[in-house]
A protein has these predicted regions:
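Compositional signal for N-terminal targeting/processing segments
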Residues: 1-609
């Protein structure tokens, strides 16, 4: 019987003498978490990391700034006019190796040679999220099964790292943290003594403060996840803080909250389901188990709209620890193209549509923000309310459109078709003519002319069974062409978009002309037998309409009793299903802004978008 090989003789073993090798996928949070556990558990005397020795001083300065991120900049040895940027981010395993090593009082060795010309290695790895299911050991073994590319440059680079390791304390336990794609070249180089590599001094190394707006573009893991990892690493729990599906779910949910708050639109259940399916499919196409931030943004734009995609990207970029300015460092706003190669771009048209990729006009003002939380609330008076005139024009125009549409639909319902004899009446009925083509006869159509006009329009977006629209108000038209209006909505001053400017979402509204006649609909005892808000608006519409017809647009028609009430008042209800209206127009018309005084009207244009 043959003798079982010792661990030191096993080519697959990561324990070689006093060296323990911990291969990682650079920048990925799963490896950072596993590495921190290993360092805190084993407490090695030396931690060797795959970082250039020339960056040691500035790298330690960057670590001292954490959790605020930094970027190291040094000239490209092959082209001094170009710079190389190295982001120092919490989720990077090399960052975690140095941080945790210093915590356990280990000596930290920067073992990468200062040759200035790092070889380009294939950096395609299986999705690190699989570690949760198979463990880190099986992940590493599965990667090593397939031989990786070897070149003279890779061998020389590995030899330089091996030389640094061979010069460490031979009696101390050494934890070697290196990229997974360099593991086997370094293991081979450690089998024989190595010569000191050529050293190239870098002329100038600078530490920069990246602006918070650019973090999502320059970091490997998106900042939202980095922030959660910072909270996770102190206790290494709870695990769901950095579990990717849970992080993705929380990010999309928080982005949805901001989307509803900023636009007044509501995401439907089917959109959430499709969003989950879309992100899963995009991840599968990329060979990943969980979608990244780019795929999530693409899915958000495809399933919902550009506004939601913006909120997803903005939420992913949220990193509260990062400051927009630094007293000691220069602040830079970098792009992905300056850090990475083969970047992908996604254009989000959030505020200004750009047909045919036209340039945005010069002088386009950015949306104003509060200087500090609660600034606009302090400036809100709340003693009176009024509307925003440009929105009045839009909703009046929409009301006229609905009235024309209602009359047209009623006329269509009353039309009749007959064979052509002496007059084509209101035109040829193509459908009926084609249906009876074998007869060789023409059929014409006669529309029934509607006598009378529409005196009131009621539009119900939501019946509000859950009391999501508690704000009830009635306001009067300011001139002869502006309707009196009663509506229920979300509380506008709970969502301020400017000083004294509240943003709300209609649940439903009533419009009627002529103006200056309507008393408060919501406190009128004549309508108290209404079972809900839509019925109260319909009763008021029947009561205040000076014309025969009253338009009612909702998801379902009113109860039959309202037909009797309408007939008693010599009125007729014209019902239009809400689904028959253009969704884009509905979305636009549903947002309303309420101002706390007439003086705000001059300021509102700077805050509304």
């Amino acid at each position: 019987m043959s003798r079982a090989p010792r661990a030191s003789e096993d080519p697959a073993s990561l324990r070689r003498g006093n060296f323990t090798y911990f291969p990682v996928v650079p920048g990925r949070v799963e490896f950072s978490a596993e590495l921190r556990r290993a360092i805190l558990s084993d407490k090695p005397k030396i931690v060797a990391v795959e970082l250039p020795g020339s960056l040691e001083d500035v790298y330690l300065q960057a670590l001292a700034r954490l959790p605020e991120m930094s970027v190291i900049l040094y000239p490209d040895p092959s082209d001094e006019e170009r710079g190389i940027y190295v982001p120092v981010e919490p989720c990077d395993p090399f960052t975690e190796a140095v941080r945790s090593g210093l915590e356990v009082d280990a000596e930290v060795i920067f073992m990468e040679p200062d040759s200035g010309d790092r070889p380009h290695l294939p950096d395609t790895y299986p999705d690190p999220f699989s570690i949760r299911y198979i463990g880190i050991d099986k992940y590493i073994d599965a990667y090593r099964i397939h031989p990786q590319e070897r070149t003279d440059e890779i061998a020389a680079h590995a030899a330089g790292m091996a030389w640094k390791l061979q010069g460490s304390d031979p009696l101390a336990d050494v934890l070697v943290v290196l990229s997974l794609n360099l593991l086997d070249p370094v293991l081979d180089a450690m089998e024989s003594p190595q010569q000191e590599p050529h050293r190239q001094e870098l002329p100038e190394i600078r530490l920069l403060n990246p602006h918070p707006d650019c973090l999502a573009e320059i970091t490997t893991e998106y900042p939202y996840l980095q922030d959660r990892y910072e909270k996770f690493r102190t206790q290494l729990s709870p695990a769901d803080l950095i579990e990717r599906p849970k992080v993705q779910f929380d990010l999309l949910r928080e982005a949805e909250t901001e989307y509803v708050k900023n636009t007044g639109d509501k995401m439907e259940y089917w959109q959430r389901r499709m969003l989950a399916r879309f992100t899963r499919n995009l991840a599968s196409i990329s060979g990943d188990l969980v979608a990244g931030i780019f795929d999530m943004t693409v899915a958000a734009r495809s399933v919902v709209d550009d506004n939601y995609a913006y909120e997803v990207w903005h939420m992913a970029n949220r990193y509260p620890s990062q400051k927009g300015a630094s007293d000691l460092l220069e602040t830079v706003n970098l792009s992905a193209a300056e850090i990475w190669i083969n970047t992908k771009k996604l254009r989000l048209r959030r505020r200004l549509p750009r047909p045919k990729q036209r340039l945005a006009p010069r002088g386009l003002k950015r949306r104003k923000k509060e200087q500090f939380e609660g600034e606009w609330a302090r400036q809100t008076d709340g003693t009176a309310i009024c509307s925003y005139p440009p929105e009045d024009l839009v909703i009046e125009d929409y009301g006229r459109f609905l009235k024309r549409k209602a009359k047209s639909m009623l006329s269509e319902e009353r039309s009749r078709t007959e064979q052509f004899t002496t007059s084509i009446l209101d035109g040829i009925d193509l459908r009926e003519t084609i249906r009876n083509w074998h007869e060789g006869k023409l059929y014409v159509r006669q529309l029934d002319r509607i006598t009378g006009e529409v005196g009131a329009a009621i539009v119900i977006f939501d019946e509000d069974r859950d009391d999501r629209y508690p704000y009830l108000t009635t306001w009067l038209g300011e001139h002869q062409n502006e309707s009196d209006m009663a509506f229920y909505s979300t509380p506008p001053f709970e969502h301020l978009v400017g000083p004294g400017i509240g943003r709300a979402e209609y649940g439903g509204f009533l419009m009627t002309l002529p103006p200056r006649r309507m008393v408060d609909v919501w406190s009128d005892p004549d309508y108290d037998f209404a079972q809900n808000k839509p019925e109260r608006l319909l009763l008021a519409g029947l009561d205040y309409s000076t014309q025969r017809y009253v338009l009612y647009c909702a998801a379902k028609p009113p109860r039959s009793i309202f037909r009797s009430i309408a007939a008693h008042l010599n009125r007729r209800i014209m019902y239009i299903p809400i689904g028959a209206l253009n969704p884009a127009q509905r979305k636009k018309i549903r947002v309303v802004h309420v101002l706390d005084s007439y003086e705000r009207r001059d300021q509102a244009k700077d805050y509304l978008w």
